[in-house]
Amino acid sequence: MLKIVQGALDTDKLLKDYQEEACTKNFGAFCVFVGIVREEGNVQGLSFDIYEALLKTWFEKWRHQPKDLGVVLKMAHSVGDVLIRHSSFLCVLMGANTKNALKLYEYFFKNFKRNAPIWKCYLSDNERIYAKKKDHLLKGSGLLA
């Protein structure tokens, strides 16, 4: 399941809901990653732009891969502004055992960072500053793709 949320994530509620689902399904592994906007220089927060249609397509392809290992993938990401010390990203991999859930972690995050159509801007002095250093070309993007 993919959730796109305006502003900061309510990680307490999301984690509670996902953990209840894991317990209902009798899963023994509940692996969580939470991305928190950290203080850096004079940055007051981050702002995210998401190409929702592409993100949903990417996530649907990715979501089916863990099923073969008995793992369920949940992801939530912010769109818009998120101030420092608030969460912008949550990923949960849950399954019957830890081995399979942890096996997918590194691969998922590498793939997410390279292929998810999410762009980041720094919020500084009431301006959005595009984070060009963090950007890369998406496979299959561009006019001649």
Swiss-Prot record:
Role according to the record: Converts molybdopterin precursor Z into molybdopterin. This requires the incorporation of two sulfur atoms into precursor Z to generate a dithiolene group. The sulfur is provided by MoaD.
Protein name: Molybdopterin synthase catalytic subunit
Biological processes per GO annotation: Mo-molybdopterin cofactor biosynthetic process
Reaction catalyzed: 2 [molybdopterin-synthase sulfur-carrier protein]-C-terminal-Gly-aminoethanethioate + cyclic pyranopterin phosphate + H2O = molybdopterin + 2 [molybdopterin-synthase sulfur-carrier protein]-C-terminal Gly-Gly + 2 H(+)
Broadest EC class assigned to this enzyme: transferase
Complex and partners: Heterotetramer of 2 MoaD subunits and 2 MoaE subunits. Also stable as homodimer. The enzyme changes between these two forms during catalysis.
Protein EC: 2.8.1.12
Name of the encoding gene: moaE
Binding site for substrate: 36-38, 97-98, 113, 120-122
UniProt keyword annotations, A-Z: Molybdenum cofactor biosynthesis, Transferase
Pathway(s) where this gene product acts: Cofactor biosynthesis; molybdopterin biosynthesis
